[in-house]
Amino acid sequence: MAPPRPPRLLPALRALLYWSLVYGYCGLCASVHLLKLLWSIGRAPAQTFRRAARANPPACLNDPSLGTHCYVRIKDSGLRFHYVAAGERGKPLMLLLHGFPEFWYSWRHQLREFKSEYRVVALDLRGYGESDAPAHQESYKLDCLIADIKDILDSLGYSKCVLIGHDWGGMIAWLIAVCYPEMIMKLIVINFPHPSVFTEYILRHPAQLFRSSFYYFFQIPRFPEFMFSINDFKALKHLFTSQSTGIGRKGRQLTTEDLEAYVYVFSQPGALSGPINHYRNIFSCLPLKHHMVTTPTLLLWGEEDAFMEVEMAEVTKIYVKNYFRLTILSEGSHWLQQDQPDIVNGLIWAFLKEETRRD
């Protein structure tokens, strides 16, 4: 007699509970932001809808010491990507992937630091900055983002690189390591756990669910972009400068010109939709089918990260089947490569010079 088949109801029930959580929390987050909007309008209606004109980029975005602005059009999607490159062509490639709400400029300290021994490329991800931004939400699925990096590597004439990712760029870096391990000499991730750790942890820990509330808020069409833009992009400025979330407590490592660079880029017409569309596809792409990373890996973590609980960093090791080092920096914020650049650069140098091998 054949063994009884497991009831089909259980997977269906799990899926129902999962999507009920996603959309239920999405509705809650939307309600909170709607109340914030109404409060702002009630207090200062004119200020709420005011936006300063920003026709010209700040001078720091054209600083020649950071490198050369370049563009590459990849074959598969036909999209054109913008990047800033420093260091001589022909040197080993170091590819830098930024997070949200960032762009290539988040790597300014690393562009200067590593150009002596590497061809350092700081990319604007799909939909960000001067890179092309497809209109359709489906164009931002994780499979597309992974394919972008593979095709960019080919277009730059490299088969391997040192890959460094922060925040959402860290998510993509982990996935590249899972899908295309042969492309990565060494993997460095800053303040983002292995994606499988993240998806499992967030469902079991309400505190992390709260910290990641923007993932759910971003599922709503158009409203998140609007909320980021009111009060002359106050929410964007707050992320980088507030006591709780800022770069080095109240943004002490961020100059006025640095902050204006971020506001300039994201204040351009339609500049927020592409970045937020990255998040609008995440729940349909996870959990992963494959998990293990076989590349030597360094995970750097700011202990004062307002968005990610440090316990996720410690659990990540189980998904790396190779050399793995975790370094947690006390008083480091979520924006670690900008917050403590000298320390971060030193740790990266040490890891790059270590003799590690692929198991």
Swiss-Prot record:
The active site is at D167 (nucleophile), Y279 (proton donor), H334 (proton acceptor). Signal peptide: none annotated. Residues 92-337 form the AB hydrolase-1 domain. It is a single-pass type II membrane protein. GO terms for molecular function: epoxide hydrolase activity. The chain crosses the membrane at residues 15-35. Keywords: Hydrolase, Membrane, Signal-anchor, Transmembrane, Transmembrane helix. This is Epoxide hydrolase 4. It is found in: Membrane. It comes from Mus musculus (Mouse).
